[in-house]
Each structure stands twice: as structure tokens, then as C-alpha cells.
Amino acid sequence: MAWQPEQEPLRQLSGCLKDSLSGHNKTAQKQAEIMLAQAKSSPDINNYLTYLFSSAQAPPGLNYSPEEYHAVRSAAAVMLKNNIRTGYKAIPQDSLALVRSSVPLALQDKNQSIRSYAGNVITEIVSRGGILGWPQLLPELLALIGNDSGAVSPEAQEGAMAALAKVCEDNKKILDKEYGGQRPLAFIIPKLISFTTNEKPKIRSLALGSINVFIPQKPQALLVSLDTLLNCLFQLANDPSSDVRRQVCRAFVQIVEIRPDKILPHIEGLVEYMIAQQRKIEDEELACDAAEFWLTVGEHNELWKSLAPYLHKIIPVLLESMVYSEEDIAMLEGGGNDADEDDRAEDIKPKFAKSKSARTLANGEEEGADQNGGNYQKLSGMDDDLSEGEIEEFDDDDDDDANPEDRWNLRKCSAAALDVFATDFKAPVFETILPYLMTNLKHEEWPFREAAVLALGAVAEGCIDVVTPHLPELVPYLISLLNDPEPLVRQITCWTLGRYSSWGASLNTPALRAQYFEPMMEGILTKMLDQNKRVQEAGASAFAHLEEKAGASITPYCEPIIRQFVRCFEKYKDRNMFILYDCVQTLAEHVGHGLSQPQLIDLLMPALIHRWHKVSDQSRELFPLLECLSYVASALAESFAPFAQPVFARCIQIIHQNLEEYLASVRNPILDTPDKDFLVTSLDLLSAIIQALEQKQSAELVSGSQPRLFELLQFCMEDPENDVRQSSYALLGDCAKYVFPQLEPFLGTLLPLLIQQLDLDSILDEQIETGFSVINNACWSAGEIAIQHGKGMEPYVPQLLERYLAILGNPEVPKSVLENAAIALGRLGLENSEIMASQLSTFSEPFLKCIHSVDYTLEKATAFKGFSLTILRNPQAMEKDLGRYFTAVSRYKMEEAFKTPLTADLQQIFQHTLDLYKSLVPDFGVFISSQISAPDANNLRTIYNL
């Protein structure tokens, strides 16, 4: 007999579900949330949720208005989906069977949001249970959409298509795996292509959107249908539905990335088409998707040149699109002199901590740094427990009303495309926009003035050579625009001046710097205290950019700069405080010890310490403040000592509190999980302090910490978040370098955790980049510990070797991680060469290959010393790699090695190794000549008297 609910539990549960969405009665809402959390443990909970969600009418005995019952169903769907997400394996099979049979009924519901919720539950089941967990689902969805019988309602068709679109988006990889010799995509893709001709525009756009999900993955099923898809796109290009045309634009953009050869023959027609779509400004999203085409083609090595003949057509459209729309102006005007008004909660952007960049000692490059240097970033939405469609019923904020300055839009996309074109084509781009600039930079109407300044800023990097002759005239005019009556003009002028600050900073005579660079710097600094908060923000951001470009040459101006920063600390509201910290830390980063002059410390530190006392341990402002203090501590070095103790103690307290809250949330699901950024920034600041101070004071701080630092660090090293572990291993390595006696008693606990972290299998596919950053820092810290711990590493050598070999032998591992693993392996041989010698033949080749690209630093010297000491223990094991080793020795630059006692004897060890082989190998001179190049052989003979 089919499962049936009991009346009383159904009544209670439905009441709690209704109250959980009761925004006007917070007490009832909180009580309902507690009751629902407790109800999760009931074995039948998912049956009840399914029953409520899939029943179109309120079951007998439940007296709700249609609006109330809709809220009950919506909340039931969200809770059901979250239960499936977090506890799929614990759900009984008969409950899952009920869900699978009932939820698809909701795809036929008259209410669009209920159909959307059904799609969310369906895709969650597929994500957790796999394709084989519900094999009949895909054929059923495809049959509903296809409607071959003609009996399927329009709502059911659209509901099934929306559900299939979600399944495709959330399960890209598993749909392209083989099941019984067949890949689901092999039948899904042709069906999706056929659905793009459906009479319903919603189905056409969702079908094409689903195809777009797969294009970047290049699945075989799509590649074999690519010509059919292209024909389909050309058919749909003038579809009456703008949603469909939007997906057409996106498809062409995606195909650029995977098969540029398919785009090239059609480039002329595509240029005309994208221009036409971008000019449909009544649909900004469509226009923005069309503008993405220029950005993508412009950044494509094989295609960008194909746009050259059309620049005269494309660039005017980009310039048109960079003028604020009337709607944007209506939203943005009226900001006026708002500097004294407090920020609203929604004005304050979430700030996410950057975990300590991976310790790429090898060449001093920071892994994960932004390599392209672009000034335009698309910010994706943050994932949470809600999928698309789930929040729409209860969210009062309409995203379309978001501040146009805070979202990726047509104006920003067009400016980014102009930036890319400037980098690609250089002079022709500036020549094309010059008449526009001449007309509009002094335009009477501010939106045109503003757009011209934006255009000038957009071409700054690509066209700098052709713009430079005009800058002596342009820069003073831009500085005058900093006093424009319209705040948006002042705002964009700050940005553009920041983009040209590298020109000002590079002026090489005092007279030229006084004429251009100093007024530029002073103008931007002044705007940091504009009467408009957006202008303040732009001024601060531009000044951080100027600091970066000027580097250490800004040192003589530190005092007036810091005085202005201090005034900003007194005046800024919350939102701009975040970017002010960035200004301070950028100054500290580039001026370094120049910041440690007493008068500068006396100006800056009271302002920072005042904020330090004012900001609570729960405030998000703590993240940028801690990060800023990390840079300041590094710059001040020993001069940070007077401020170190309370800062260090508070970081320990924040870490302890965060770990306690996390453990409590694990034990009790009703409690919120704490924000791990508090851990990341606190760990990084501890690292900076330990590096900055004299070792004696660092040791005192570590010894006196309550709770004990290394007991807390153990928990952080086991944290599930990659960012936390990345910072933890950075701190572990710093402690090994600077406070090893305090660390040593804890190594028995910490080293096994470190070895566990070096397992490549611990990296999750979806977190591969941050996963490698953790392993990188773990390798680095292992190398630092090996130097200090010496023979104490002996019990761990076999496991460490196994881990290092797996890393060095994996082609997927990034170069910086390979280098740090090689350094750590070499350092292990400093005191443990005897037990490593028997394994030498297994690691000599990967070690020499990976260490080859490392600069001649102290790190390389220690690694080569350890490796050479291992060779001396087992010279015969090097037979196949002697040529590679002799080449490395011949080319070795000794400057850094001579600077420390640890590696001062490296050249003698090389000599000793060569002498040993000379005694072992007959006709050693002939042997060397047969193994390495003549110049390298001559080098060896000269340096080592062979």
C-alpha cells in the first residue's frame, strides 16, 4: 500500500514551513526554524515534504489560503532539496522512490515557481545519486518536452525543459560519462538541437542555453553535431525572442573558444550581427552578450586579427555603449554630497580574505597572482543553499535595480572590449577614438564627458605609446576634471588618472615629476576626501594603483600621503574603509622599510590601532584590517615590536573563538557555521608578525600564547577549507624558520598531518587550484622543517619520499608546486642522506628536471647540497642521470650559496662528488665529454680542476 501521511504531523510540519517564511513575525520564524531542524531527524520527514510539495491543493484538514499554501509548498521544496544535498545517502530507498515518483508531477503545475522548485529537487537527486540512480528520468523529461503524442500541457513541456536545463547545468561531467557503453549526451545533444525549433520561445531559449552549458567542455557528442548547431544558430539569429537571440550570442562566444576555425569564415556576418544586437539597448542583457563577442574574439590568439578590417564599425558602437543610459543616470544621480551619511548594510560589499599566497620560494613568484593584469573583472554570484528560482518568491531586492556601478553591464563590457582592442591593435584604435575624444572630452552634457574619460582610460595600457605625446596636454585637463560638478565625472577621472599613473611615475627629471606626477598624485589624494562617497572610493582605488606603479619612488612623499590616509580614517564610512586598508597595505608593500621612520610610524599606527580597538571580533571589517596589518608588520619589521603583543594575542583569541564556534556548529546543525575568513586573516597576520620581529620576541609571543598556538594550528591544518589550510602551512613554515625550538615539541603531532596533506588524492576536482596551493605550502613548510629538524626527520623519510615522488611524477601538477617539492626533497638529504641513498635512482631524474628551472637562491643551494650528499652515499645509483647532474653543477651560480654557513660549502661538496666519480670512472675526461656539452665540460674542468 502507498505511503500516507498522518494528520497531526502533517498539520504541524505545514505550519512550521509556513512560519519559516514569515518575514513579518520574527519570533514565529525563529521557532519554526528550530522545529524544522529537529524534524530533520524524523525517518519520514522527506515523505511529508514530498507529499506537501507535490499536492497541488491543500490536503484535507489543512486550512490555508492559496498564498499560504503556496508558501508551504515552496518551503517544503527548499527543505527537501537541502535534505537531499546534505544527507542523500541516509535517505531510505522507499522515501527516494516516493520522491522520484511524486516530484515530476509538480513539473506540470500551473505555477511557474513550483515548476522551478521541482527542477531544483530533480537536479539535486541526479547530482547526489548519479544517472544510474534514476535511469528513467532523462527519457521521461525528453518525452515530455518532445510532446510527440500532443497530449502534454504547455506548462509541463516548459517545466520539463527547465528541469532538464538545470540537470545539464549542474551535472555537466556525469552526463558525458559512459554508462553501459553509452553517454547520455549522445542522445541529449541532438534532442536539444531539435528543441531549438520548438514553437515556444521559452523552450527554444532553454534548449540553446543547455547546449551552451556543454560547449566549453568540448564533449564528442557536441563536436560531431557542431555543423548542425551552427546552421541552427544562423536560423535562430533573427528569432523574435530576445531570450533566444541572447543564447545565440552566447553560443557564438563559446564556439570562439573551442573551434575558432568554425567562426573565421563567418566573421564578417557575425560582426554585422553582433553590432545589430548590441544596438538593441532596450534589452541590455542581449546587448551585453553581443558585446562579449568582441571581448572574447579580441582575446583569442587566432582570431583577433580578423577584426582589423571592421574596427571602424565596431569601435563607434563600443563608444556609444559606454555612455550611461537614462535609467542608469536616474539611479545614480542624486548621490551628491553624501560623504557624511552612514552606509546602508547593502552598500557594504562582502570582503573575502585572500589566503596567504602560496610560498613559491623557488623563483619568488606568487602563485595565483593575477597574471593578466586586467582592470576588468566579472564577479560571479556566491553559491549558497539556494538554486536559481528558489529565492524569487521571497526576495524583495530586484537585481535589475542594483547599482549599475556594482554589476557587470554593457558599459563595462564595452570598455573592457575597447581595452582589449587597444592591446591588440594599438595605434589604429587610438586614431579611431581621437575625433570622438576631441568632441566629447569637453562636451557640455556630463554623460558624454564621462564616457570620453572612460574611453581614454580604457586605452591607457594598450595605446600608451601613441597616447604619450598627448599626455602633457591631457593630464592637466584630467586633473581639472577632478573638480567637475558631476560626481560621476570626478569618479571616472580618478580611475583614468590611475591608469596613466605609470607614465607620471616614469618621468625621470625632478622638473617633469613636479609638473605632472606630483599634481596627479595630489589630485587623486585630494579626491580621497571628496564630498561624494563614490568619488572617495574611486580616488582611493586609483591611489592604490598609483602606489603600485610608482613603487619605491613614492617613498619621499610618504608623509603627506599618510597624513591624508589618517584624515580618511577619521572620515570614512564602512564601505570605503575597506579600500583605504588596501591603500595602506599597498604603500607598505612598495615602500617597505621606508615606512619605518619614527615620524611615519607616529602618524600611521595610532590611526590603525584606533580602528583595531573599534572593530569587533565579529565585524567583516576585521578581514581587511588584519590583512593590512600583515603588510605593515612586514614593512616595519622590528619597529612593529611595540604593537605586536596585543595584536598577536587577539589573533590567537580570534582563531580560538572561530574553532570553538565551528566545532559547536558541527555538533549542532541549528548553529551557524562561522566565517573561516577570520581564521585565514588571523593566521596570515601571525605569520607576518613572526617574520617581522627579532626571533627572541617572536619566541616569547609564541611561548606565551593562550591557548597554545600549535594546538590551535593543529586544528587549522585539518580544517576542511583549502584557504585555511593554505595559510596554516604558511604559518607552520614560518614557525620552522623563526621559532623552531617552540615548534619542535609539537612535530610528533603536526608532521603526520603534513604528510597526509601531501597526498595528491586529497585534491577535489572542483577545487583543484586552491588544492594545489595547499600542497605547495605544505611542501615549502616540510622543506623548512627538514632544515631545522635534521635527523629528527628520519622516521618520516620513507613516507615523505613517496609523497614527493608522486608529486614530481604527475604531469598535472603546476610548476611552482613541482619546484617546491623538489626543494623539500633535496633538503631532506641534508641530514638524512644515508637512508635516502638506497632510493636515489627513483628520484634523481625528477629532482634534477624540476629543480632545473629554479633560480639560484638559498633554497636551491640547500636542496642541491642535500641531493649531492645523498649521491656521495650511493654514487652508482646515478648512472643514468650523471649527464644531467654534471650539467647542473657546471652551470651552478654560487653567489647566494656563499652567503650562509649552511651552504657555504656547496662548491666543496660538488668538488668532492666530482672527485669521487673521477676515481670510479676510467677515462673520466672522455666520459664527461660524452655526457654533456663542450662548453659545460670546459666549465667543469676550469672550476673543478678536472
Predicted regions and their residues:
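Karyopherin-beta/Importin-beta family HEAT-repeat alpha-solenoid scaffold
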Residues: 1-946
